[in-house]
Structures are given as structure tokens and as C-alpha cells.
Regions:
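A structural signal for short, hydrophobic/glycine-enriched beta-strand patches
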Residues: 1-166
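A conserved mid-domain beta-alpha-beta active-site/ligand-binding segment of alpha/beta enzyme cores
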Residues: 96, 163-210
Length: 210
């Protein structure tokens, strides 16, 4: 099981949803991709951080295929520039040549952070995706670059009762209905070995903040 108790899961969820921030300006904002129905959440979350001068740059992933076999080539750079983020502060990363998903995004982001020797980064995803995105990120950090300090910031709120397409454009429902499958994915990917446990993420947060 991903979490050993409801209390452990509740603690982790609350800390991810209301995380501390780094003491210094972050090296980057890692932006996890979303469908068009939900992408305003991540764009506005990233814009808010950047406008507050809390990070040097924004990183997003592209490349590979969706499960529908469509190329994953989001037009995020254009949209970030339209939001006022300068092009020189935007880094598009090739995340994979195979299947593009949250885990391959995390692998690419942390490999790039390690190459650049970044010290602090923010992770931004839509609220119902944030838990899985952050746990994926920390899982890769612990295995490949444990010196990196990763901080969680939610994308902006979107109405929970609105219908939206999610997860590679193949899942739809009201946004609150998408949470159940997010949890199922966390359990499945933990059982597969892709994700560390809730306890390991909490231990990472405690060590990060010492």
C-alpha cells in the first residue's frame, strides 16, 4: 500500500496542498502538462509564481506519444509568452520518444535539474493532479538527485462541478470525479515500483525543511 494509514495519507495530502517554499529564489518552476480543459490552472499558477519573482525560469515537457498515438506537442511556450513570461525564461524539454505521461515527465525534469545543478524547484500541477505529480517528482529525486529540494504549489482553482477531459484526453467527468482514478493510479504505480511510499515522501519533506 502507498500509505500505511489514513492519518499518514492525510498528513501527506495536506502538506502537498499547502507546502512551504524555499528560502531563496527557486531555480525553476516545473510545470506538469494538462488537457486543454484544465491547463488554465497550471498556466495561472505558474504566472503567479513568476510574477512574484519566486523563480528564475519555467520548464515544461513535450515529445513522445499519448495513448491515443497522437504526438504530444503542447503549445505551452506560446501561451506562457502571452502571459508575460519572457521566452528566455522558458525551457521546453524533450521528455521521451515513447509514451508521454506524468512519470516520464518527472524523469526528464529531474535529469535536467541534475544536469543544471539546480538546488530548489517548484512543482505546479492542477489541484486534482498535484498529489500524483509531486509524488512522482519526489520518487525520481530520491533515486537520482536527492540533493534537490522540491516544493509543491497548486495550480489555480477550477470549478469542481464542471465537466473536463483529463488523462491523455481519454478520461472525462466532473473534476471531483477525477480524483478517484488519480488515487487508483498512485496505488497501481506504487505497487509497480514507480512511486515511493507516502512515508518516504514525508521523510523527504521533513529532511528538506530541517
Amino acid at each position: 500500500m502507498f500509505a500505511s494509514s489514513y492519518v499518514e495519507l492525510l498528513e501527506l495530502t495536506q502538506r502537498i496542498m499547502d507546502d512551504d517554499g524555499p528560502k531563496a529564489k527557486a531555480d525553476a518552476i516545473i510545470m506538469y502538462g494538462q488537457t486543454k480543459d484544465n491547463e488554465d490552472s497550471i498556466f495561472l499558477g505558474v504566472k503567479r509564481l513568476y510574477e512574484k519573482n519566486l523563480a528564475e525560469r519555467v520548464v515544461f515537457g513535450q515529445g513522445g506519444k499519448l495513448v491515443t498515438r497522437q504526438d504530444y506537442l503542447p503549445d505551452y511556450q506560446t501561451k506562457l509568452i502571452q502571459l508575460g513570461i519572457p521566452s528566455e525564461a522558458i525551457i521546453p524539454l524533450q521528455i521521451t520518444e515513447a509514451l508521454a505521461h506524468t512519470h516520464t515527465e518527472a524523469l526528464a525534469h529531474i535529469a535536467h535539474a541534475k544536469m543544471r545543478q539546480w538546488k530548489n524547484v517548484y512543482v505546479v500541477a492542477s489541484p486534482f493532479h498535484q498529489l500524483r505529480a509531486f509524488v512522482n517528482t519526489v520518487s525520481i529525486v530520491l533515486r537520482q538527485y536527492p540533493e534537490l529540494k522540491v516544493f509543491s504549489v497548486l495550480g489555480t482553482h477550477l470549478p469542481w462541478m464542471d465537466k473536463a477531459i483529463h488523462s491523455q484526453n481519454v478520461e472525462s467527468g466532473k473534476r471531483f470525479e477525477l480524483i478517484q482514478n488519480e488515487w487508483k493510479r498512485i496505488e497501481a504505480y506504487h505497487a509497480k515500483g514507480d512511486l515511493v511510499s507516502a512515508r518516504q515522501v514525508l521523510d523527504y519533506l521533513n529532511q528538506r525543511d530541517q
